[in-house]
């Protein structure tokens, strides 16, 4: 491909190599990148192009681009979304890929860790020690006045008549839950 750039004095010819189509069609290695509140760290979801059953949440120090923490998820599960809950802590939501569904679905499980990988633990869902069986959970809000907690909505879709959505105050360090309110009718959002 030949590109030309014109200036007021001369015309220059710039040559560029063709970019292979495979580069545009390939699955991305890094899918979602978010900067920490103090802009010290980057967190990103990483998908291994050689092993589609492996996904990671990776934290990098912006100053030297060294990896400071990794959270691994294997099999059909992966970290579908994550956010910086405060200056040091990241919360990730787990989703599952099932062959017969077009889109992955969230399992309701949440994992949290510090920027350095310390204090990594399941804080909500079936994987949490003594956790509840939920089929849906989503983050409603981070709480700037309470940096150790987030507000989530949770549902258990296994109930035949539908479920009551609960708003839960969730401690992002130990997974303690406190129900704030419950929807007055089933299947409310």
Model-derived segments and spans:
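Beta-propeller folds
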Residues: 3-189
């Amino acid at each position: 491909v030949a590109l030309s750039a014109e200036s007021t004095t001369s015309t220059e010819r710039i040559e560029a190599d063709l970019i292979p189509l495979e580069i545009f069609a390939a699955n991305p290695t890094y899918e979602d990148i978010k900067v920490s509140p103090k802009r010290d760290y980057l967190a990103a979801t990483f998908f291994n192009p050689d092993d589609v059953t492996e996904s990671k949440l990776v934290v990098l120090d912006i100053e030297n681009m060294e990896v400071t923490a990794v959270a691994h998820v294997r099999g059909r599960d992966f970290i579908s979304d994550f956010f910086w809950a405060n200056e040091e802590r990241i919360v990730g939501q787990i989703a599952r890929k099932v062959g017969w569904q077009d889109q992955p679905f969230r399992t309701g499980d949440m994992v949290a860790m510090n920027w350095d990988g310390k204090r990594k633990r399941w804080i909500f869902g079936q994987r949490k020690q003594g956790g509840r069986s939920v089929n849906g959970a989503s983050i409603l809000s981070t709480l700037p006045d309470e940096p150790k907690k987030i507000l989530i909505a949770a549902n258990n879709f296994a109930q035949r008549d539908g479920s009551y959505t609960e708003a839960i105050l969730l401690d992002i360090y130990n997974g303690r839950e406190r129900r704030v309110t419950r929807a007055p009718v089933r299947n409310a959002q």
